[in-house]
Amino acid sequence: KPRFYWAACAVLLTACSPEPAAEKTVSAASQATSATTLTVPTARGDAVVPKNPERVAVYDWAALDTLTELGVDVGATTAPVRVDYLQPAFDKAATVGTLFEPDYEALHRYNPQLVITGGPGAEAYEQLAKNTTTIDLTVDNGNIRTSGEKQMETLARIFGKEARAAELKAQIDALFAQTREAAKGKGRGLVLSVTGNKVSAFGTQSLWAS
């Protein structure tokens, strides 16, 4: 009887014993990872990115514009272009190449936690992704409004700016509504783009049609 009693106690103690330290460590590490990263949709599928990274490099002017409006400071981006509303962002950021040719040495010195690319800049995605976490947030020009909103939502999630993104979306929706109202009964319209001495017209299948 004593042998049976002590054997039964041993079984009960084994069953009730806490999980091994190694398992606890793995579990804690998994929880820490999930607390500091998140999964977001990109033009190349879902990607795991750091939450609210402090050092960000951007090779996409649309994303740079959106981040600026969200109130996110971008530490590194391309050489400046002549876009007035982006000048403050260019002035504050380190230059890490151009939209088409990243300066990998400068980027390495900056040591970003996240690289954001898109559009023409996404051609360098594969090389950029070899060195650090990189996401491609190219906007679909065939559905620019919806795609642009998704890009903004993704960036807002990464940087914890959901409230500001909701404000911006409301402003955009209001502008669309005002434009539709102003165009009522005015017949057909034509969208022109003037770049230097070049004038371009955009039709119903262009990026502006959406």
Which residue ranges define each predicted feature?
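Bacterial Sec-exported substrate-binding components of ABC uptake systems
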Residues: R3-A7, A15-Y59, A163-L192
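N-terminal hydrophobic signal/anchor transmembrane helix of membrane proteins
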Residues: N52-V72, R145, K150-M152, K169, ...
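A short, structured surface patch at a secondary-structure boundary
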Residues: R55, D60-R109
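Short, acidic/turn-prone active-site loops that include or flank metal/cofactor-
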Residues: A79-V83, G121-A122, T138-N143
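Alpha-helical, coiled-coil/dimerization segments enriched in small aliphatic residues
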Residues: V81-L86, F202-S210
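Proline-aspartate-enriched helix->loop->beta-strand connector
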Residues: N111-T117
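Extracytoplasmic substrate-binding proteins
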Residues: N131-N197
